[in-house]
Structures are given as structure tokens and as C-alpha cells.
Amino acid sequence: MGHPPVSPSAPAPAGTTAIPGLIPDLVAGTPWPRWALIAGALAAGVLLVSCLLCAACCCCRRHRKKPRDKESVGLGSARGTTTTHLVQPDVDGLESSPGDAQQWGCLQLSLEFDFGSQEIRVGLRQAADLRPGGTVDPYARVSVSTQAGHRHETKVHRGTLCPVFDETCCFHIPQAELPGATLQVQLFNFKRFSGHEPLGELRLPLGTVDLQHVLEHWYLLGPPAATQPEQVGELCFSLRYVPSSGRLTVVVLEARGLRPGLAEPYVKVQLMLNQRKWKKRKTATKKGTAAPYFNEAFTFLVPFSQVQNVDLVLAVWDRSLPLRTEPVGKVHLGARASGQPLQHWADMLAHARRPIAQRHPLRPAREVDRMLALQPRLRLRLPLPHS
């Protein structure tokens, strides 16, 4: 008896345990059409390849991240430019490029001394990388140690860590006093209703600077000084101007942080026109307090054509005896002001008919009186008279 014939269409490969005809039988036994099975197989293949690619990318990122972290911690990998002539030779790494700024950032500064007029011109160009982790509203304050009471404040730059100042200020310093003079540049974060936050500062001994020619360099900022200048208090008030009627309204809200021991503090509001006393008003006195609350409003008629020529001075006075009064501190606003008072005045003009409130640090009376004569008038952009 012979063996039954074997179908040539389903040969069993040598050396395998697969059941002959298993896959064709499974395909034939499924209720789905063949094209659906092929499409499903292709989709499964694409999904498998995608998963493998994602896993490979994750592994590569982990391997790349580790050397970067190690490199950012090491100080030896920091790149910077050095020069053979340093403005401050006794301070290592003072000059640097903006990319090398450390925790407090850096400042670009130019210095020029006029031997004829005995003046030093300080050019504030820009700052970079002031503070990581969020934007600030920075401004700069410039002073010289030999010129007590004379300082310059820049305008506020909103929402930036790299403000561009492009402002120049001058200080009169006799050439003989240059070796002992120190230039101080302080940067602050502007806050309308609280104390301004220090961002860093630069102290540059002018005796170590070669002022025979114009200098322009980047300087690293250091931490703010632990001891801040003595404060005489703060005054909070609002300003409102209506160009069509010329009504300037000043609301004196409160003072705080005044020196203890004041008998009867009060606030005097004074308007000056073309550097001459024009109008003045004053609040009621508050007995025996270093934080008096006033909430008194005063209205002055200032024609729109005279806004650029007006100076507004708010001064806190103390009446210790019936016939004796002494100033505690003053705030000067107007087109000839600088820093935060100038910013407050500009905000009032830019937002006509709206009261703009702000808290200002009081400055010594002699300092404000001197600034009234020193500061040149700055033309501000005014609203339209019909607004």
C-alpha cells in the first residue's frame, strides 16, 4: 500500500516546528477581510517603531543632560574676555562682557573728565542680567562721595532685566579731590507703594581710573551695601491733572517712618512758577506721631501752557514750638525733577483726569533746595488740552 500524496503547496521547512498552514488557516478563519488585516498589521508596526524611537530619544537626552549639568557647575568652563588694562586693577574680573554676569548682573558705563570745567561726565549706557527668575522695573541712582546731597536718578524701565538707560549726568569735582572720590551706582526695583528693592551696586574709586581719555567698559555689579543711607521717612500722595480746566489736585494721604519725637508734623504743598514761589497750602497738624494720616485734598489752577514751568514741592514740617518750625524732608516733582518724582509727574500727564497715587521717600530739605537750582528743565510729552 502506498503513502498518500503530499500537496506541494504546503511544504514543511526542514528544522522547524511550525505547524504547516497555520497562518493561512488563521487568516481564512477570521471574519475580517484581508485588507483590514494588512492595515492593522501596518499600524501595529508603525506604533512599535514609534515607541522604539521615543525610548531611544529619552536615553540620548539623559546622556546629554549629565555633562551639561556638570559643566554649568564648574567655574573653569566660564568664557570671558580679559584686557591688560583694568579700570580697577585691585578687583579681579571687574570688566566683563554681558554674558559673564553673575548673580547681580553687570553695567555698561562711560567716564569722561573735563579738566577745564572740573566736571566728570558719567554715561549710563545699559545693564544686563540684573536678576534671574522674573522681570523687574529697574532704575539707577548715581552719586559721588565728595558731592553729598547731589545725585542723579534715571527713569524707570518697565518689565525688563536688561534696561537701556542712555542717560548722562555731571558732577563737579576738583582735580585735586579725584584720588579720594568714589563713584557709586545703585540699581533699584521700582515699587509704587512700598520700599524700592535694591538690585545691586557698583563702587568705583576714581583714583584708580585713568581719566586722560574717555572710558567705556562693562562692570560687574556687587551686592547692595548692608547699610543704606539714613531715611527721613516717606510721604504718600496722589496727583490728578485736567488739561481742559487746568485743575491740579494733590491729595496728601499719609506719612510714615518719620523720626520719633516729632511734636506736630504737617505737610506743606507749594507750587513754584519759573523758580519763584507761587502758591502754597498746608494740612492740619497731627500731634505726637511718626505716622500721621492726613487725607486732605488741595486744588490749584495751572494753565496748560504753564505745566512745563511748574515745580511742585511737598514738604513735611514739624512745629515744636508756637513760633518755631523745622523741615523734616521734602519731595520735588515737575519737569525739572528726576527719578521717581519725575516718573510720577509724567504718569499724571499721560493719564489725564485720573488720580495717580505713589509713595515717595523724603529727602533732606537742603538737598532738594539745591536740586531745584541745579537740575535743567526736561520737556515732557503732554496730553492734548481737550483731553
From Swiss-Prot:
SUPFAM superfamilies: C2 domain (Calcium/lipid-binding domain, CaLB)
Entry's transmembrane regions: 35-55
PROSITE patterns associated with the record: C2
Keywords: Cell membrane, Cytoplasmic vesicle, Membrane, Repeat, Signal-anchor, Transmembrane, Transmembrane helix
Ranges facing Extracellular side: 1-34
This protein's record includes keyword Coiled coil: no
GO cellular component: acrosomal vesicle; axon; dense core granule; exocytic vesicle; plasma membrane; synaptic vesicle membrane
Family: Belongs to the synaptotagmin family.
Domain writeup: The first C2 domain/C2A does not mediate Ca(2+)-dependent phospholipid binding.
UniProt protein name: Synaptotagmin-8
Gene name of this polypeptide: SYT8
